[in-house]
Amino acid sequence: MRQATRAQWIKCAIAILLYLVFLLWVRSWWGLIVVPFIFDIYITKKIPWSFWKKSKNPAVRSVMSWVDAIVFALVAVYFVNIYIFQNYQIPSSSLEKSLLVGDFLYVSKMSYGPRVPNTPLSMPLAQHTLPVFNTKSYIEWPQWKYKRVPGFGKVKLNDIVVFNFPAGDTVAVNYQQTTDFYTLAYGEGQRIYSKQIEMDSLTRSQQRAIDDLYYDAGRKQILNNPRTYGEVLWRPVDRRENYVKRCVGLPGDTLQIVDGQVMIDGKAIENPENLQFNYFVQTTGPYIPEDMLRELGISKDDTMLIEDSGWEGGLLDMGLDNRNAQGKLNPVYHLPLTKKMYDTLLGNKKLISKIVMEPEEYAGQMYPLNLYTKWNRNNYGPIWIPAKGATITLTEDNLPIYERCIVAYEGNKLEVKPDGIYINGEKTNEYTFKMDYYWMMGDNRHNSADSRYWGFVPEDHVVGKPIVVWLSLDKDRGWFDGKIRWNRLFKWVD
């Protein structure tokens, strides 16, 4: 064996030192078993790591050089994605105009501290499904418990956060892009039992029994009809869909929404500069020019021109009753608008006659799905956000709010019996939370599937913090017609 040079010893020492610093950071001393292999790569060279370089067959050398490069790249990407940063593309308009559809984000894992993966055996760059093959991109065994490596800080109020979708633990594959499993199950159950029940006249226990009936019926409907709903899958925390929203409530806060304004502990919080709501906009007769909509920043997907006569009754109820000489209603658009966009349109008296905010009946069912309330997306709560170590008294009124935290996120067994609440077989009326939770909402308040619909975000679901937009593409434009939004390149996220 050829004696190692001084340079090789120095390289080996630096590599081992950096690796030990990494192990100290992630607090995983199992990784020490790798140290002898690092030593062998630089010094002893007992293992023929580059055996293919000595092959006399040029094809073998060529193929193996590519394999070597690809494996190295995949391993590097794997560790960078887990511990440093990952790329994320904005898929929906829920955070417009703060973040736009087509924005590509640099998401820092260091901001809140990276998580050790729940499913360590997975393919890099694939969240849960391998493209083309349409199979799982991860192996379910082994599964590691939640552990977060120290980072630069914690989630703060008004931070934009990337996280795993909490209600994405169970998915009906054919509906995974539109409706979470639980909302789908309750909706199908209510459709099956179509006779309306006056919940106001029932006790909380009776209401719970009705909600359980809806959910069980809907769940059976989904499981028994895979052709319609697709296969039903369970996903570990780190393999659930990535969502991005703004944190508007921290652990221990009491949150309430009053007329669209978020209140924390009774005080209004600062609204994002580009807060949006949906409106019905009626013109004085002509259509709104496409150039004007483009200049306002309203995408084609968010622009709906209402021409179906079936809408007329609803439009008249909203006071959108301006008609032309032939007696036909003037054109009405359904648009998401910021205050600035609202003022711009309303100020154009020659074109715009009326603007009315979208009524509440256009919203879906609020969280918790199994609690009868009169909450809606603009008037919600109050609701207390769980904090690690905090103890609450459980009642019939608040159990549906915190039941999912207790069972799905913190792994307990909960039963409601005639004589009370049982957790892990023991009767109790208290529970102490093991994790912190957050309340996430989109800036596009009427076009955002957020905590108002599916509840709290547990700390173990937090992925990272978007730092910068490194690329932004407008899907409504061509490459030679402004597809690249140059003014958004390398724009800081706030």
Positions of PLM-derived features:
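Extended hydrophobic leader/signal-anchor segments used for secretion and membrane insertion
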Residues: 1-494
